[in-house]
Amino acid sequence: MAAADLSHGHYLSGDPVCLHEEKTPAGRIVADCLTDCYQDSVTFDDVAVDFTQEEWTLLDSTQRSLYSDVMLENYKNLATVGGQIIKPSLISWLEQEESRTVQGGVLQGWEMRLETQWSILQQDFLRGQTSIGIQLEGKHNGRELCDCEQCGEVFSEHSCLKTHVRTQSTGNTHDCNQYGKDFLTLCEKTSTGEKLSEFNQSEKIFSLTPNIVYQRTSTQEKSFECSHCGKSFINESYLQAHMRTHNGEKLYEWRNYGPGFIDSTSLSVLIETLNAKKPYKCKECGKGYRYPAYLSIHMRTHTGEKPYECKECGKAFNYSNSFQIHGRTHTGEKPYVCKECGKAFTQYSGLSMHVRSHSGDKPYECKECGKSFLTSSRLIQHIRTHTGEKPFVCVECGKAFAVSSNLSGHLRTHTEEKACECKICGKVFGYPSCLNNHMRTHSAQKPYTCKECGKAFNYSTHLKIHMRIHTGEKPYECKQCGKAFSHSSSFQIHERTHTGEKPYECKECGKAFTCSSSFRIHEKTHTEEKPYKCQQCGKAYSHPRSLRRHEQIH
């Protein structure tokens, strides 16, 4: 089901809302949810977390503050990589949280009765959004835009324009009988994306409804100034939050993968609150969903149903968005363009990752060795070098891989097609690039040279590993005994001494080994193969170490 079919819920209302359950809960909250592999045309609605009125009342002030931070960061991510988009009223309202203090005692004893306010915000939000990079000229989602002839402000609703014009001509505001304050209508501000809590000290005019009243401190009272851009804030915590926009620090932890980001506890609490009600359970795996439609989509993972088939190549997909993205491989369409270098991408996730290459932002850090990565998927792959996990197993030969793409390439070696076969040794590869890398082993070409000792290598990765000999770096440490290793393979073999695992078993005699090299040496004892011959006397050995010991005699 396309995301667009599920996007019309209210933030705070009595009506049911849609939370896009086909995505992970954390992905609906953190800004990195924008790289969802099923994402197509991204709007703020796609990355906004929706609440029912009942759910909102369950959140305490800390969780509501966290919600504000999340929504603002999501919007900034969209604005960074997208074209022109009209600022949602929700964002305009939330932005003022950074420069707003609660007027003394006004909120005490008040209930957060926001039905009317949020309903207006949501209506305006639904009308005012277009997809990233698409600005409808003169219209919003098919609706005519209305602009004020006196001041030039633009409105998405004619009724809002009328209210705005009436306020300009009469100066009418809405008076709060309880506190004697004057209020501008919410509509005239929300349609333009203006800040909702702008406060005039002399006239005491607010642009929020009387349900909740905030006073904005004057500029003179903002003593905490940003050294980067000069923006001022009323307290140090607001300044620290703002500084994250400059240094690229991320507020939230992607719970499944665990990079060391702050505020993970608060995020987990919010996630659990969002997932409190999931009555529709999958009988196969027990996973729960809020709505039966989401459960139906999930069931495709068990049934293998792929209802969306490409007419060009016959490839089928579980999800409509995946099908649409695939279609671009045939049309050549690349709608997501980098503003820095002009490089274009078929889907938003590619652009999102590419943008980080310009900023140098690598938010996913390995807790074992400190290495950072652009994406969470790269971090997961890297973590497997520490754990030795290889979850992708070939059903033909049993060979296991840490990365699914490597398994895909390997599977081609079992097919009749041998387009990537080495003509020298007959070895078959899944991809031409793998064959090209392999060919270096037959040639004398070793383009990567160590500046310390002059040793040359076929591959840059081999040079990096070699450099650890000079630097003494040993990033792979055993948690059992504390022993450290410079190579991940050595670390994995060492761990087997603790677990007792011996995966390499001889079919001739049943003897098992912890590493493949020992196994290969042992196999030669059955074949009596002795490929390592002494050039001095002609004596042959099955292993190079035996030959080296023998050569010392000469």
Swiss-Prot record:
Major place of residence: nucleus
Record's GO cellular component terms: nucleus
PANTHER family registered for this protein in UniProt: ZINC FINGER AND SCAN DOMAIN-CONTAINING (PTHR23226), ZINC FINGER PROTEIN 709-LIKE (PTHR23226:SF430)
Gene3D superfamilies: 6.10.140.140, Classic Zinc Finger
The species this protein was found in: Homo sapiens
KRAB domain span: 42-112
Annotated transmembrane regions: none
Gene: ZNF426
Zinc finger map (C2H2-type): 146-174, 224-246, 280-302, 308-330, 336-358, 364-386, 392-414, 420-442, 448-470, 476-498, 504-526, 532-554
Pfam families linked: KRAB, zf-C2H2, zf-H2C2_2
GO molecular function, one term: DNA-binding transcription factor activity, RNA polymerase II-specific
Cell compartments where the protein resides: Nucleus
Biological process annotations from GO: regulation of transcription by RNA polymerase II
InterPro entries given in the database record: KRAB, KRAB_dom_sf, Znf_C2H2_sf, Znf_C2H2_type
Top-level taxon of origin: Eukaryota
Keywords: DNA-binding, Metal-binding, Nucleus, Repeat, Transcription, Transcription regulation, Zinc, Zinc-finger
SMART domains from the UniProt entry: KRAB, ZnF_BED, ZnF_C2H2
Coiled coil: none
Record-given protein name: Zinc finger protein 426
Residues making up the signal peptide according to the UniProt record: none
